[in-house]
Every structure is written in C-alpha cells, then in structure tokens.
C-alpha cells in the first residue's frame, strides 16, 4: 500500500494487485511443467521423443502416459487462470480518503467486475491493525464500521510490510479520520 498525500485534506493509497514477481515465476514454471507433461504423454502415445531431455517414448501410455497427460492438462488450466489474474491485475485498486467531503472510496479490481465501496466518515468506528505472526503471518490495516461485525480490509492481500510501517500507517490514518486505533497490545 503506497500512500500519496496530495494535500492535508486528502489521502490516496495505491494497492498493488496480482502483478507480482512471484506470480510471474509461478506462471512460468506452470507453463513449462504443463507443456512438458503433455509432451511426455504424447511421446508415450506416439513412441517418438518430443522432449529434448529424457526418453519419454519408452513410458507405457497406460497408466503413466495418461496420468502425465492429466497432470499437464490440470497444470495448463491453472496456468491459464493465473495468467488471466495477472493480465487483469486482480486485487489492484486504491483507497481514497477526503476530509473535505467526509468520504472514503475503496476500489478494487475483481475477477469479472470492479468492486467499489463508498462510505462517509460517520460510518467508521475505528481503524484496526490485524497482526498475526507465525507460520502464515498477516499484517493488515482495516476499517471497523458501525453496524458491521467484520472489518473492511484496506491493505492488499499478500502484502507483508514491516510491523513498524504498518503501525505508523494505521496511526496516521486513525488520526486523519479522527477515530481510535485498535489492535495494538
């Protein structure tokens, strides 16, 4: 979440989506692996080596070739889905806070349509820091809304910033919105 202060009365935070290096690496590995498994399955069926490494033509088509073909098809389906998410930049968007109009606008790129939430400052109860350490750590800033049990997350999914930076951003936002900051122990 990159914070850009255009003036003292407005805050705009850009949220990064699925265009991350890790998604490009996983997509590349899935592409190579899926195509490799399909070529190995075709090689075992036709008896000709279509891969430069190994000797897949010696594999029995039933059951090894069929299983490798199924793995290749599954990998390529996952690969198409992942590249689609990267192409549309799933999860990207922005958070916009405006003191002049007392409004908050949260916009994210969804799978099939954009998600847009507009709130007034009166609907915001507090800013919450959701911090959990361990095997699957999470450091996220969220808005606690009046009349809603679950907080509305502001940070992008998969962002793991230093704890001090998350606390500073949460405190700055709580001060800007003139609400309490929850989650600090």
From Swiss-Prot:
This is Photosystem I assembly protein Ycf4. It is a multi-pass membrane protein. HAMAP family: Ycf4. The keyword Kinase does not apply. Belongs to the Ycf4 family. Signal peptide: none annotated. The chain crosses the membrane at residues 21-43, 65-87. Keywords: Membrane, Photosynthesis, Thylakoid, Transmembrane, Transmembrane helix. GO terms for biological process: photosynthesis. Seems to be required for the assembly of the photosystem I complex. InterPro entries: PSI_Ycf4_assembly. The keyword Transit peptide does not apply. The gene is ycf4. NCBIfam families: PRK02542.1. It holds the Pfam family Ycf4. One of its GO terms (cellular component) is plasma membrane-derived thylakoid membrane.
């Amino acid at each position: 979440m990159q914070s850009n202060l255009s003036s003292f009365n407005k805050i705009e935070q850009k949220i990064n989506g699925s265009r991350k290096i890790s998604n490009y690496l996983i997509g590349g590995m899935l592409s190579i692996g899926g195509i490799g498994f399909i070529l190995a399955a075709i090689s075992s069926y036709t008896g000709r080596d279509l891969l430069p490494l190994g000797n897949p033509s010696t594999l029995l088509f039933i059951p090894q070739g069929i299983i490798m073909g199924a793995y290749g098809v599954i990998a390529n389906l996952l690969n198409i889905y992942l590249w689609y998410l990267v192409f549309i930049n799933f999860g990207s968007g922005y958070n916009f806070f405006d003191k002049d109009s007392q409004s908050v606008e949260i916009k994210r790129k969804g799978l099939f349509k954009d998600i847009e939430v507009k709130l007034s400052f009166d609907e915001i109860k507090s800013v919450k820091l959701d911090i959990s350490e361990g095997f699957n750590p999470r450091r996220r800033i969220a808005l606690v809304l009046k009349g809603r049990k679950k907080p509305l997350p502001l940070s992008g999914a998969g962002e793991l910033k230093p704890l001090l930076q998350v606390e500073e951003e949460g405190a700055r936002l709580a001060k800007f919105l003139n609400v309490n900051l929850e989650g600090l122990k």
